[in-house]
Amino acid sequence: MSILTRIFGSRNERVLRKLKKQVVKINKMEPAFEALSDDELKAKTQEFRDRLSGGETLQQILPEAFATVREASKRVLGMRHFDVQLIGGMVLTNRCIAEMRTGEGKTLTATLPCYLIALEGKGVHVVTVNDYLARRDAETNRPLFEFLGMSVGVNIPGLSPEEKRAAYAADITYATNSELGFDYLRDNLAHSKEERFQRTLGYALVDEVDSILIDEARTPLIISGQAENSSELYIAVNKLIPSLIKQEKEDTEEYQGEGDFTLDLKSKQAHLTERGQEKVEDWLIAQGLMPEGDSLYSPSRIVLLHHVMAALRAHTLFEKDVDYIVKDGEIVIVDEHTGRTMAGRRWSDGLHQAIEAKEGVDVKSENQTVASISYQNYFRLYERLAGMTGTADTEAFEFQQIYGLETVVIPTNRPMIRDDRTDVMFENEQYKFNAIIEDIKDCVERQQPVLVGTISVEKSEELSKALDKAGIKHNVLNAKFHQQEAEIVAEAGFPSAVTIATNMAGRGTDIILGGNWKAQAAKLENPTQEQIEALKAEWEKNHEIVMKAGGLHIIGTERHESRRIDNQLRGRSGRQGDPGSSRFYLSLEDGLMRIYLNEGKLNLMRKAFTVAGEAMESKMLAKVIASAQAKVEAFHFDGRKNLLEYDDVANDQRHAIYEQRNHLLDNDDISETINAIRHDVFNGVIDQYIPPQSLEEQWDIKGLEERLSQEFGMELPISNWLEEDNNLHEESLRERIVEIAEKEYKEKEALVGEDAMRHFEKGVMLQTLDELWKEHLASMDYLRQGIHLRGYAQKDPKQEYKKESFRMFTEMLDSLKHQVITALTRVRVRTQEEMEEAERARQEMAARINQNNLPVDENSQTTQNSETEDYSDRRIGRNEPCPCGSGKKYKHCHGSRVARQ
């Protein structure tokens, strides 16, 4: 600690000192607010709104607003906000992250900033990690907010459009992070303003902010459509992978291995060696999937390479019951941070299909991205952003760097007395499991409840089998049993209860010492007062037993890559001043040790074990683990920051496109925009044949006439104009061409009516924009995947990505203008008389075909508008419309049948 910090206190201490002055002010108001009637207290909401309209700021009314919520909470919920909760509420109002320990009442704390900021009328979004928490928190706080005249909405998957609009129209909306992001993307795919859901993105309060803004940061939200089906290729390539041999190190000048591929476990990437490449190519040629003499790395074989690498990663880097589970014939991803399943999510880049082929389930088609955004960029769209969690301080630097959010550690209401014991290390996993079982046995005998944290479904099941063998009764909470999550967590605080949980499964629900009598009461149908009193008495007895036994004991079966996840596991114990204890059991076979410690350190540690099964505890061990975790955290932070730098490029483009789209949806008349685009497009085309400030000898008039005819359907005798009028120069010629294009367009408009033409313009513009944006996203994906190769040419990949993507974006905008004007200029408008004449002609032709015994296409639904002509005396051209009226070319309709006959 520096001398200045000793004198002035840390930044956190200074912030808390300042906020405590506000707490004193709020506490002084309490007697006056207690004296108010219910109606007078309710009337405060309208009073605050009027004062805000009159020019007062949120900070000016904050003390009174917080005092109002506190008093209303006492009357409606029977809960009074602690002083530390008032501090938390003020921190959340100030665009900060409040670190509040487990059990300190984050749900109640959130009511303070939500009420205050909702007074502005812009809407408040409270963001949770799953549907259960969104519903639970909304129903818990709904009576309080409705008492104060605020409406509450819940936005979760599966709502109808009307229910979703009602949820967003509420003053305070509880929602999951994924649903908010997807609704944003859906709004920007809407074809009318009535289809949109979200209002202005004003204030988001993110619960478990570390989980959403850090753990999920690299997960893009993607809305996709089906791409070309290549399921058979995944199944074929899947057969190749088991024959490939792993090589421990990459080939160098000094070392030439005998394997076919190497793995980078940190980045979860696989690489073929030269030997492996040859082996794969020979197999593909033998299977007829690649011609002889071709290379896997040639541009024409990029799709094959993509399938091979996806299959290799699926087999070597992704484990069943660790990274995913197989459920009802589908691959379901397991969240590496929470241990929860993520139904409906799919890995991209063909990885999900490769895993489906590996596990022998139905291989679904690949998808093409239609719209996407990362959580990092979505939450930065909000005017105000704040968050709360039990563990943010270790990631404070990242929150500040990426989101501009300061982290403030809120003191606990009561001192924390949990006993965090030193880690113990074992030589191998078997010795470690033996020690864990002995620790659990000791706790069970003393009637102390135990929560055992594992890092994967597989490890939780291994430990469960070991406990079964030892005859210890226990519950398992992992991705396979997530439906029973609330029930298992409710029982985890009973005397002698043993619960195995993957990572932070059950996070967001407190483990109450002695069990949860309310959860037991909820199981009873219409419980009597006597039954409730009996449950309370039973709980009090169990609570006393558990308190005497030492509270909840936490066992970590290995260290996670992030200190924050370890702290979250420990944080389940010792809530609100309760007793508790924690200890981590480690082995040299743990993933963290294998991947992030070099062989030298591992050998040194192996030598320290002289007796089989002995445990090692030392300060050096703590330093080694801290060093490994710091490396991993830095590696992941760099990855997230790197992703954001690339995604920021796409984000600027996304913002521009969505702004243009919203402008189109909000305006029924875009004729001015169309006119401006028409001038740009025609001038651009003319420039190619009549360069600006050029001599007449340099003009390519014939080429211009052909181009205008082919692209825009305009037959203009420009050569004749020039012969007839010697005064026609470059500018006047341009004006004449554009004037004719505008005149022809006006004539079409006169035929169909102004409203119909405006509607048509808008439809063409939206459809073209969406199609080109979808293609652009696919191109950006390909660019992103290969841009790192520019580094070999001594170029900065990020700068190259920015330049290339800007060029592609500019080309897309030019293409948008061109395609819109081409479509609008070429469109043919028919009068009612022409339509009737065309229908008569179609019927005559159909009759003539029947006379000639040509079968009419029964599937034909469209009518081809064409002039009446006798086809019986001449041969029909292959590319002419088929006389049957199907709308198809003759060669694709009856022409093909005639050829077959």
Curated annotation (Swiss-Prot):
Changing residue 879 to A: Binds zinc, unable to bind secB. Zn(2+) binds at residues 882, 884, 893-894. It is found in: Cell inner membrane; Cytoplasm. Residues 849-866 have a biased composition (Polar residues). ATP binds at residues 85, 103-107, 510. It is a peripheral membrane protein. It is an enzyme of class 7 (translocase). Residues 888-901 have a biased composition (Basic residues). Its cofactor is Zn(2+). GO terms for biological process: intracellular protein transmembrane transport; protein import; protein targeting; protein transport by the Sec complex. Binds 1 zinc ion per subunit. Changing residue 889 to A: Binds zinc, unable to bind secB. Belongs to the SecA family. Part of the Sec protein translocase complex. Interacts with the SecYEG preprotein conducting channel. Has a central role in coupling the hydrolysis of ATP to the transfer of proteins into and across the cell membrane, serving both as a receptor for the preprotein-SecB complex and as an ATP-driven molecular motor driving the stepwise translocation of polypeptide chains across the membrane. This is Protein translocase subunit SecA.
